[in-house]
Structure formats: C-alpha cells, structure tokens
Amino acid sequence: MSKLVINNLDLYYGEFHALKDVNLDIEEKEITAFIGPSGCGKSTLLKSINRMNDLVKNCKITGDITLEGEDVYRQLDINQLRKKVGMVFQKPNPFPMSIYDNVAFGPRTHGIHSKAELDDIVERSLKQAALWDEVKDRLHKSALGMSGGQQQRLCIARALAIEPDVLLMDEPTSALDPISTAKIEELVIQLKKNYTIVIVTHNMQQAVRISDKTAFFLMGEVVEYNKTCQLFSLPQDERTENYITGRFG
C-alpha cells in the first residue's frame, strides 16, 4: 500500500529547475533510499515532502504530493503535516536543553502538558531510539553533553515523540563514526516495523544494507526506482550502472 505518492512534481528555485517530473510511490512500513550525486535533487525532494521549502525565496512547486490520499500542499496545514511527518537531519541538532525536554518539546507544542503523559512519551521514544538505557539516569542533564551518535539517536527520539506516520532522514549518519553509524542503521531497520522511512544517503552500501527500495536521482530526475536488490544487481538504465559502479559521482 502506498503511504506517499509523488505525482508529476516539478520544483524551481527561481529559474533553476531543481526537480523534473518526479513520480514515486513510497510504500507503507518500508525503507526507501534516495541516492545520487551531490545536487541531484534528492534532499530537495525530501524537504518538499514536509514543506521545508515553503520559506525558500522564489521556490515554486507544481504537481502533487499526497500522504494517505491527502494533498500535502492543499489539504494539510503545516502543523498537521509536521505531526504526521518527522525529520532527522544530517548533523545532530539537539536543542540546548535537557535530554527530557528535547524529547518532550514536540508533544508540548501539540498541547500535551501532563507530567505523567510526558514521562511515558519520553521513555517510550527513547526506548524506540535505543537510547533509554544509556540516559535514563541523566534525563535532566544537558543534551549537548552527549556523544555525536547519542545526539543523533536523541534527534530520532524527538522526531518519534509526536508519533509520525513517516520519518524522513537526510544523511543521518554522514557525521558519525562507523560504530555509531551501525547503531543508527540497526535502529532504522527496527523502526520500519512501525514507520514509513525515507532516507537520503551518499553511502550506496548503506542503501543496500537497510533499504527495501531505492530511487536514483540525476540532475533533478528520477532515473530509476526499483527494489534495492534489483537496482544494484541488475540496473535497467546505463546511467544507474555507471553511478553504482563508480564511473561518476
């Protein structure tokens, strides 16, 4: 079942045509990877899904993005959308507050103020992010004192606290060491039991390890979209083969 449908999407930054007639069906409770060289449009599309491009000057979008049949730009207001679609960025970005308050920030924003309820949400979210056992005795210490890998898992917990349907991840391990990267990858695989996940990655081995489907972007176009095992073992487009075999990129 398709969770997200992207139909005939074009995006312009002024005169620059950043996304060109993008069409993708993203399945529920699967991990979909976006790969491609820098500047190919993969992060631009990710940010279009939860309307982070709204504040970009001279950004124009045509076409449709629907989430469970509702048009992201025409039927959902921004608060509804951000509750349904969580985002994790390339560089860990914990807020300058306690671990507890980082996770509770979203629920409080959406009107939850009961301490008992917030306690439950914080514990559940940190457990989902495989972080609870490491921080349960220092919840009220600053999040800025955590390691980089812990900070990124905290950012994942913060995104999960509002119980989104979709989790967007923009190169979530690119700033992390190999051990922290492995922990995040294991976590992402576990999370797909409950969430639809879209991940942008420059690491093709990572896409192979964790994703169910992969879309290859080049110069604003989706060149190929297929099951990950098929795209990497038997690409249908010569440009895909050239990219995954290292001939460019």
Swiss-Prot record:
Entries under InterPro entries matching the protein: AAA+_ATPase, ABC_transporter-like_ATP-bd, ABC_transporter-like_CS, P-loop_NTPase, PstB-like
Signal peptide per UniProt: none
Enzyme Commission numbers on file: 7.3.2.1
UniProt KW keywords: ATP-binding, Cell membrane, Membrane, Nucleotide-binding, Phosphate transport, Translocase, Transport
Chain sites annotated for binding ATP: G36, P37, S38, G39, C40, G41, K42, S43
Compartment(s) of residence: Cell membrane
Keyword Zinc: no
Enzyme class: translocase
Its membrane topology: Peripheral membrane protein
Family listed: Belongs to the ABC transporter superfamily. Phosphate importer (TC 3.A.1.7) family.
Protein name: Phosphate import ATP-binding protein PstB 3
Organism listed in the record: Streptococcus agalactiae serotype Ia (strain ATCC 27591 / A909 / CDC SS700)
